A protein has these predicted regions:
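An edge-strand/N-cap motif at the start of beta-rich repeat modules
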Residues: 29-59
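Short loop/turn segments immediately following the C-termini of beta-strands
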Residues: 44-46, 94-96, 143, 153, ...
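Beta-rich, blade/repeat-based domains predominating
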Residues: 48-49, 74-85, 122-133, 137, ...
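Short loop/turn segments immediately following beta-strands, especially the blade-tip
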Residues: 57-63, 104-111, 151-160, 210-219, ...
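A short beta-strand motif characteristic of beta-propeller blades
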Residues: 66-72, 114-119, 172-177, 222-226, ...
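Blade-loop segments of beta-propeller domains
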Residues: 66-135
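Blade-level signature of beta-propeller repeat domains, shared across WD40, Kelch, NHL, RCC1
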Residues: 361-366, 373-398
Length: 398
């Protein structure tokens, strides 16, 4: 299948006046118990029995989870992320036009969360949030409205007035049901904090913005240059109908792996000497001959940079790929069933020893041991019961 590159038709960028607010410093991390982590689970609360954000302990020496409990009651926290300082946790609360981003203080021993404040997400249905590399800003992707926003983190952990707001506009993909409009689904800062990357499911594109870490502002993608025709070095386009959902970078930043939800495929982009991302491979996350319904969901590169994992909702599996260190291309290794239905998300523990799969419709988190030599996954028999799990974030336990 031919991979094309199209220039973004329109991009509306709104830069908000900068408020004179104190930004959060980069405090030292608290001393952690060796191999002991807190695992925070984001959930959907609407039409489920979930109360909000859950937490359980996880011991990487044994692979044993501890008893799970409610860390904070909050509506539909579909994405959670722990600040690099370990002092704060932020959650995206999906609520249509009333969507918010919540800030919590973290108790590093018990895992309990204390609400610091909530602010509007400046869009509808935020589904992803992350931090810039300085830890001074929260980056938010609002799915239904196709907008992204940047918020400064104040010294007490609360979020200040936005420093940037952008709405994606332009030609949408061919899937009339899912690509009727722009849908920002993932946002991350690059390794050097100079660019912010946004996967837009509706546009079949990863948008790339210049990021100013001093002001928290974003600037539009640069126009075409004679050195790299016809590729815009600050955008990357997938096949029509791919529906980019999430992406992951190689540890050295040379390769970007974009998961297409609608076509259940990973597109590999290589970063060349001119700073442009060029598509070099597309590979399916499904076994040959599979004809059932499937929506690819999550993607992650193992900490050792040798393997890539992607989840399939429908086939109910994790696809495992080996990464070629020279050219970044993928070779299929295996499919492993997740032990439940609708694996919307999974997370690899920071030590790289375990993968935890969140099965949304079977209300469980299933633990797998990772073979760090082959990338293989083996279920340990450990299962954590939690209502409608859709995201998981690890943090070292004090």
């Amino acid at each position: 299948m031919k991979i094309t590159t199209r220039l973004l038709a329109f991009l509306v960028l709104v830069l908000a006046p900068l408020a004179l607010l104190s930004s959060a410093p980069a405090p030292k991390r608290a001393a952690a118990k060796k191999g002991q982590y807190l695992a925070y689970v984001g959930t959907y609360t609407t039409k489920t029995s979930s109360k909000g954000i859950y937490v359980f302990g996880f011991d990487t020496a044994t692979g044993q989870p501890s008893a799970i409990e409610v860390a904070a009651a909050t509506p539909d926290p579909s994405w959670v992320a722990v600040h690099p300082s370990g002092k704060f946790l932020y959650a995206a609360n999906e609520a249509g036009k009333a969507s918010t981003v919540s800030a919590f203080a973290v108790d590093g021993k018990s895992g309990k969360l204390t609400l610091l404040g909530q602010i509007p997400s400046l869009g509808e249905d935020p589904c992803y949030l992350s931090f810039d590399k300085t830890g001074k800003y929260v980056l938010v992707a609002n799915y239904s409205s196709g907008t992204i926003a940047v918020f400064p983190i104040l010294a007490d952990g609360r979020l200040g007035e936005h420093t940037a707001l952008a709405k994606d506009q332009g030609p949408t993909g061919p899937n009339k049901e899912r690509q009727e409009a722009p849908h920002a689904h993932w946002i991350e800062a690059g390794a050097h904090n100079q660019f912010v990357y946004v996967a837009d499911l509706g546009l079949d594109r990863v948008l790339i913005f210049k990021f100013d870490a001093t002001s928290g502002s974003l600037t539009p993608a640069a126009p075409l240059t004679a050195k790299a025709p016809p590729l815009n070095p600050l955008s990357a386009t997938l096949n029509p109908g791919a529906g980019p959902r999430h992406a992951a970078f190689a540890p050295d930043g040379k390769f970007m792996y974009v998961l297409g939800e609608l076509q259940s495929a990973v597109t590999v982009f290589a970063n060349d000497a001119e700073g442009a991302y060029r598509a070099v491979q597309q590979i399916s996350t499904l076994p040959k001959g599979f004809a059932g319904r499937n929506d690819a969901a999550e993607i992650a590169v193992h900490p050792n940079g040798k393997f890539l994992y992607a989840s399939n909702r429908g086939h109910e599996s994790i696809a495992i790929f080996a990464i070629d260190a020279k050219n970044g291309t993928l070779t299929f290794v295996a499919h492993v069933l997740t032990g439940g239905k609708e694996p919307r998300n999974f997370a690899i523990d920071p030590s790289g020893q375990y993968l935890l799969a969140e099965n949304q419709l079977s209300n469980n988190v299933v633990v797998f041991k990772i073979d760090r030599a082959t990338g293989g996954l083996t279920p340990t028999g450990q299962v954590v019961e939690v209502p409608s799990p859709v995201d998981l974030a690890f943090w070292p336990r004090e």
